[in-house]
Amino acid sequence: MDSEAQARFDLIASNLQEFLNPEIIEKILIEKRSPRVYWGTATTGRPHIGYFLPALKIAQLLKADCEVTVLLADIHGFLDNLKAPLELVDNRAIYYRNVVTALVQSVGVDTSKLNFVLGSSYQKSPEYVMDVYRMASMVSESAAKKAGAEVVKQTGNAPLSGLLYPILQVLDEQHLNADCQLGGVDQRKLFTHNPYSAATEWLPKLGYSVRAHIMNPMMAGLGGQKMSSSDGADAKIDLLDTAEAVAKKIKKAECFPKIVEDNGVLSIVENILFPAAVLNGHGEFRVERRDAEPLVYTSIAQVKEDYAKDLLTPQILKPAVSAAMVSLMAPIQAAYEASADWQEITLKAYPPPVVHKKVKKVKDRGSRFPGAKQENAKPEEAKPAEDAPTEQLAQTSI
Ligand SMILES: N[C@@H](Cc1ccc(O)cc1)C(=O)O
């Protein structure tokens, strides 16, 4: 590889946890072509700051002159235990498109060449559907189950659609004509046969070629574990959260002094703030101190070292992370404020829950309590006590 190809390769490979079959990409770069990479996202819950990871990777891929496609996987949102009901899925796809575009633009990368494809636009074609049937006849039920174990919601009497999900995701590589698929490391079992069978083993069964796979690390959540859309509102930061909400959530986050592992706050610095700072051109993370010069970092290794020594304490780290996140999210929020369409689609994609007003139960004190109106007394007395049998039943069942 010449130095230009090497620089492109390094950008593609940066900040990854795993890169499978890199030789596929190397060959394309040596031939001075543009690798075609796709990232799929099931259009379900509201995207949180964890979406910065794929978005920053997409920004790097665009800079490395890759052809990038974002698959708005509406059908997958529905196949996965109905996480996104069919009637909301279209609006959610538009919401995701706006979010991903704004995320990539927030680090100054042009999105005019970023391609968006809606899953349902090709996953219902006769060719695609026939491939689903062919693959379903060649892949065992247990392999499909294992492949989806970390991605598809696991329930007792799971719907059959959860077994189709991995088959469709694997076929997308072929039908989107990709050289490489990007995903979080949680997608690993869908990507490779080690330890389970999926894309790299299933595609050749239909005569299709094996693709490269690039995997982002998973962010630790603010409560310590992997960040997920199904976390409670306090454990994840929504991209449209106000500065106060961001500060409050980070302040509450689990962040033990000197402990670097599974630390959600440090995970933000490592996986979001540094890669974004590099794309933004300054490459720095600053921590202000009250009585001393600010600490200025240019690598996560230095940050972790100082944190382990308690020179960088949770008390000074947290406000620095809040401030940096708020300024990183500012252009996304400005884009939202400036777009009446986006605001309208938000309401349609995530309709506020209908609150059933609680009607205050008026205690039935009967008609004989002191002060009861005399005229009510008679008819009430004449009526048989309707509640009595239920009350008895409830008592016996206790
Ligand atoms: N499995 C991805 C979504 C996805 C769907 C289809 C694909 O082809 C790729 C990715 C997720 O967890 O969100």
PLM feature segments, named:
Residues 239-265, 271, 275-304:
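C-terminal subdomains that position terminal phosphate/3'-OH groups for nucleotidyl transfer/ligation
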Residues 170-268:
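Glycine-rich, Lys/Arg-enriched anion-binding loops that position phosphate/diphosphate groups
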Residues 1-215, 277-293, 301-398:
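NTP-dependent nucleotidyl-transfer catalytic core
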